[in-house]
């Protein structure tokens, strides 16, 4: 008898287009019963711009709406939202905003047993779709199992209004799939770790798709952002299929997490991932110059100075990256890089 299995939870509804925020009520009602209570989790800036539009659309569909404003993405905040959802018997928790709001809503909905709806206002990373959440307060800065969204509602017009830097960070996060899949294959060969070809191919397709449209994305056109968003959704779905973050997160993400620990000035997640991908592509013997060229095309950082971090911080991050998730085998090996090897890698690739 074949006993190996894993569960795949996928979104029921994915909508990407112009003006869809004002139609969100119809999409949310498709995954919730009429009269359901929808708790919108959002930050102060985003909620002041978009909450009233979202509420009007939800209430037009007979849904009751509440707002929970958060200021950080910590376990404590997420647990607070979960308690409120449980005590008030809230059926739907919607994340409106960037990574913080979506990660908190995602985690809280799992804890409360509520339906989760993802409504991103920036295209900064693929967490808009994935069933994993990144929160501060755990022992290590890694993604934890949460809940896949039942519905994803992405208004391209809203995304286009976001600071360009955040959307370009999403490009960096997607470029990281090139090395993430290489690391996954390596772990399969050397550690007999489960490897799913379909999930890996889907993640790679996301990276290849935005690579082909790099110039359009650089221009910040609606079409360019639509391609970026669809690729982020696709990458998130690859994690749903794999049942882990493996197809989307490898050594380049370990570097990014490590850099966030050691750097005084914190770059955006996708920015750090992009720079990490340059170096990890070199270690894999791949065309790291092409990776750097793609990042330059869209205006993403390619070195420490552009990231706003110190050279020594990059080197230190490289030396501790393998210890962020010791159970996750990557090109960095079990013990990671020595300081000498880390500095040589960063210099060879022009990161420092």
From Swiss-Prot:
Cell compartment(s), UniProt: Cytoplasm
Its EC number(s): 1.1.1.261
Similarity comment: Belongs to the glycerol-1-phosphate dehydrogenase family.
Reactions catalysed, as given in the entry: sn-glycerol 1-phosphate + NAD(+) = dihydroxyacetone phosphate + NADH + H(+); sn-glycerol 1-phosphate + NADP(+) = dihydroxyacetone phosphate + NADPH + H(+)
GO molecular function, one term: glycerol-1-phosphate dehydrogenase (NAD+) activity
GO terms under cellular component: cytoplasm
Keywords for the protein's UniProt record, in alphabetical order: Cytoplasm, Lipid biosynthesis, Lipid metabolism, Metal-binding, NAD, NADP, Oxidoreductase, Phospholipid biosynthesis, Phospholipid metabolism, Zinc
Keyword NADP belongs to the record: yes
Mutagenesis / variant outcome for changing residue 173 to N: Decrease in activity and in affinity for substrates and zinc ion. Loss of activity and zinc binding
Note on cofactor: Binds 1 zinc ion per subunit.
Its biological purpose: Catalyzes the NAD(P)H-dependent reduction of dihydroxyacetonephosphate (DHAP or glycerone phosphate) to glycerol 1-phosphate (G1P). The G1P thus generated is used as the glycerophosphate backbone of phospholipids in the cellular membranes of Archaea. Is also able to catalyze the reverse reaction, i.e. the NAD(+)-dependent oxidation of G1P but not of G3P. Is not active toward glycerol, dihydroxyacetone, glyceraldehyde phosphate, and glycerol-2-phosphate.
Annotated Gene3D superfamilies: 3.40.50.1970, Dehydroquinate synthase-like - alpha domain
Name by which UniProt lists this protein: Glycerol-1-phosphate dehydrogenase [NAD(P)+]
Binding site for Zn(2+): 173, 253, 269
Subunit structure: Homodimer.
Temperature-activity profile: Optimum temperature is 94-96 degrees Celsius. Over 96 degrees Celsius, the activity decreases dramatically. Hyperthermostable. The half-life of activity is 30 minutes at 95 degrees Celsius and increases to 2 hours at 90 degrees Celsius.
CDD domains named in the record: Gro1PDH
Source taxon at top rank: Archaea
């Amino acid at each position: 008898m074949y006993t190996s299995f894993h569960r795949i939870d996928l979104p029921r509804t994915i909508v990407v287009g112009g003006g869809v925020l004002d139609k969100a009520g119809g999409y949310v009602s498709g995954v919730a019963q009429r009269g359901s209570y929808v708790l919108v989790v959002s930050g102060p800036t985003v909620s002041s711009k978009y909450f009233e539009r979202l509420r009007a659309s939800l209430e037009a569909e007979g849904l009751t709406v509440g707002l929970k404003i958060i200021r950080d993405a910590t376990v404590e905040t997420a647990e607070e939202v979960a308690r409120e959802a449980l005590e008030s018997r809230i059926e739907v928790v919607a994340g409106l905003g960037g990574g913080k709001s979506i990660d908190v809503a995602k985690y809280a909905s799992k804890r409360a047993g509520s339906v989760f709806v993802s409504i991103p206002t920036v295209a900064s990373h693929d967490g808009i779709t994935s069933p994993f959440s990144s929160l501060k307060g755990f022992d290590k800065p890694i993604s934890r199992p949460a809940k896949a969204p039942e519905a994803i509602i992405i208004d391209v017009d809203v995304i286009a209004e976001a600071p360009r830097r955040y959307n370009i960070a999403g490009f960096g996060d997607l470029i990281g799939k090139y090395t993430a899949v290489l690391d996954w294959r390596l772990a399969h060969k050397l550690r007999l770790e489960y490897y799913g070809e379909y999930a890996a191919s889907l993640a790679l397709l996301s990276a290849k798709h935005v690579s082909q449209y790099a110039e359009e994305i650089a221009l910040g056109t609606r079409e360019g952002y639509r391609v970026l968003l669809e690729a982020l959704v696709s990458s998130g779905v690859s994690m749903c299929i794999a049942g882990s973050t493996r197809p989307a997160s490898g050594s380049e993400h370990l570097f990014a997490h490590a850099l966030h620990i050691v750097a005084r000035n914190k770059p955006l997640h996708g920015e750090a991932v992009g720079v990490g991908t340059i170096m990890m592509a070199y270690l894999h013997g791949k065309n790291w110059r092409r990776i750097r060229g793609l990042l330059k095309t869209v205006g993403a950082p390619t070195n420490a100075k552009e990231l706003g971090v110190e050279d020594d911080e990059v080197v230190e991050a490289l030396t501790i990256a393998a210890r962020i998730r010791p159970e996750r085998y990557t090109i960095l090996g079990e013990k990671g890089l020595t300081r000498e090897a880390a500095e040589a890698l960063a210099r060879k690739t022009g990161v420092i």
